[in-house]
């Protein structure tokens, strides 16, 4: 079989203990359909098939997609040779589960796709770059737009660290498992999302600036007005965007 393709960000993981751990984190039952993104050689696919009713494996690499079905004859595996960003998630049953070892270059797009989909998964388990996993699960004091964007839709927690040397070829950095349990109701109402993110982006556009400056320039509001607004919400104008909780941003957005 051909080796990993650098252009597709492919890194093979064959450590059985880690693969079992990733599959276990998803809480898969015998009734579940699992969407696997980028199954590669099928090492994780094997663990998913042991647990799930069905696995839908979306693989961009035509060579790998062609070979995968032959590795698992007589199973409930469906292989789709397609870019996950163009895959219609509405084709999946409700409450499906996503498990994936995701190429680093496409991580943010995949998270956005899944968390904002009309047919959202119940649980998302991703093996991604360690730094990105930790940013997703950040708390006030270390927040980012990525963390806010994920956490309004899901409860995020971290799983195990997977050292780079366990992959073939080894990536330049370690990876980490991150688990997103989708919320029944997003923290921000759909009708308020546009306003909410306009304000959050204004705060983070110059993340090292204090809020009085970043919100003033980003929202085109005078600094005294920003200070009064923040004070009314119990927020210091000397704080930075990374210091605020999602609830803080929700409180601020209600005045717009």
Where are these regions (language model features)?
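Catalytic cores of RNA-modifying enzymes
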Residues: 1-202, 231, 242, 251-252
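C-terminal lobe and adjacent flexible extensions of AdoMet/dcAdoMet transferase-like proteins
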Residues: 200-256
């Amino acid at each position: 079989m051909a080796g990993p393709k650098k252009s597709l960000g492919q890194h093979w993981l064959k450590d059985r203990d880690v693969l079992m751990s990733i599959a276990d984190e998803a809480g898969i039952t015998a009734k579940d359909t699992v969407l696997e993104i980028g199954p590669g050689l099928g090492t994780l696919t094997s663990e998913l098939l042991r647990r799930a009713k069905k696995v839908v494996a979306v693989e961009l690499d035509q060579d790998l997609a062609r070979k995968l079905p032959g590795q698992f004859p007589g199973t409930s595996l469906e292989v789709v040779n397609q870019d996950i960003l163009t895959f219609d998630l509405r084709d999946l049953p409700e409450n499906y589960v996503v498990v994936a070892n995701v190429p680093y270059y496409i991580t943010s797009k995949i998270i956005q796709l899944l968390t904002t989909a009309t047919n959202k998964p119940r649980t998302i388990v991703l093996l991604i770059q360690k730094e990105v996993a930790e940013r997703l699960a950040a708390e006030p004091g270390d927040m980012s737009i990525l963390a806010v964007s994920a956490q309004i839709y899901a409860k995020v927690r971290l799983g195990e660290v997977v050292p780079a040397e366990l992959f073939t070829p080894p990536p330049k950095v370690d990876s980490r498992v991150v688990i997103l349990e989708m919320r029944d109701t997003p923290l921000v109402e759909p009708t308020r999302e546009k306003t909410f993110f306009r304000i959050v982006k204004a705060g983070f556009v110059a993340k090292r600036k204090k809020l009085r400056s970043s919100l003033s320039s980003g929202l085109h509001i005078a600094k005294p007005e920003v200070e009064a607004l923040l004070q009314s919400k119990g927020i210091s104008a000397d704080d930075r965007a990374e210091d605020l909780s999602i609830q803080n941003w929700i409180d601020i957005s209600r005045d717009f």
